[in-house]
Amino acid sequence: MDQPSGRSFMQVLCEKYSPENFPYRRGPGMGVHVPATPQGSPMKDRLNLPSVLVLNSCGITCAGDEKEIAAFCAHVSELDLSDNKLEDWHEVSKIVSNVPQLEFLNLSSNPLNLSVLERTCAGSFSGVRKLVLNNSKASWETVHMILQELPDLEELFLCLNDYETVSCPSICCHSLKLLHITDNNLQDWTEIRKLGVMFPSLDTLVLANNHLNAIEEPDDSLARLFPNLRSISLHKSGLQSWEDIDKLNSFPKLEEVRLLGIPLLQPYTTEERRKLVIARLPSVSKLNGSVVTDGEREDSERFFIRYYVDVPQEEVPFRYHELITKYGKLEPLAEVDLRPQSSAKVEVHFNDQVEEMSIRLDQTVAELKKQLKTLVQLPTSNMLLYYFDHEAPFGPEEMKYSSRALHSFGIRDGDKIYVESKTK
């Protein structure tokens, strides 16, 4: 069979990790010995190959000499071949079959939809535990073939593949724990439920940017579909109903949820969104990446009760009654005006005179002196001011900085200001 034109995996490997481009690391086992090669071979006698090889965006179209791959890559455990020009699964198989320790393989953004994956080729992937096929447009038939030949696969990435439906294989994959299938076109729950059938041991499901419009499944059926699901991301889905959020309680092991950017929550403030979701999901310990503390949960549940306290009984969610049983009926919080005071009524003391007056707190000490000039008959340059807080245990505080704003003293109604002359 003729080797495809273009750059080979082996050629790129030698170029990138040659001693000239990748300084030799001294120490036992750091270098890889390569047997003598034909004259004119681009390989050096020793290369410094790490166990993680990153060969993305290198224009790779084919494998190259398999014996050389085996000699160089016996210890390699992670391989990134994303954004190359690999379109033949047979060439990918030549590479992978000669990397016996391989556990992580990234084939994203290679046009692998242009060829059919045969079972003999798929078998070379058998040791891989983490497989990335983002933007490869891999068909479900290809995915099924891979799943059958990867008994230890734990993580699978199928993002940006334009899936509108999900096809179930005849045999489910019990080993898979994490599935990223973001940025596809999976809008119907009937397609999402197939993932539960296909991957019964699934721990983490990332469905972001799929515009899922609803979770249409009886509660008991949801528990059977995803019995081990601990984390789900519905970021930028199309959910529009609180009933869909309540459905998440049917996943028996669910602890972590991501729900940013969904139509349902758009009308609410940031505080309302988080508190209302936390209150509806009693088992969730992490929301949108942030831990839900015991204190935050109690605050959210109390907020939830007050939020629905005036809603007609027929419209109150079931969770409201559960929380009433827990906390009892709560009165609405009193509205407290926390805006800073703009003025204060104070007593101005000068010699034996006491004058009650209102002063603006947004003015400075210098401006207050001008206001007092007529009252105390002193030039501002000869005026000393002292502020006395009637509730403070300390004595008067000199107001000696002319540019200091009065509100910074914490002046309140009933406080006193003493005026003295510098020259008595």
Curated annotation (Swiss-Prot):
Alphabetized GO MF terms: alpha-tubulin binding
Signal peptide location: none
InterPro entries: LRR_dom_sf, TBCEL_Ubl, Ubiquitin-like_dom, Ubiquitin-like_domsf
Residue windows of the LRR repeats: 73-98, 99-123, 124-147, 150-172, 173-197, 199-224, 226-250
Expression tissues: Abundantly expressed in testis, but is also present in several tissues at a much lower level.
Function: Acts as a regulator of tubulin stability.
Gene source species: Homo sapiens (Human)
Protein name (database record): Tubulin-specific chaperone cofactor E-like protein
Organism lineage: Eukaryota, Metazoa, Chordata, Craniata, Vertebrata
Coiled-coil ranges per UniProt: 349-375
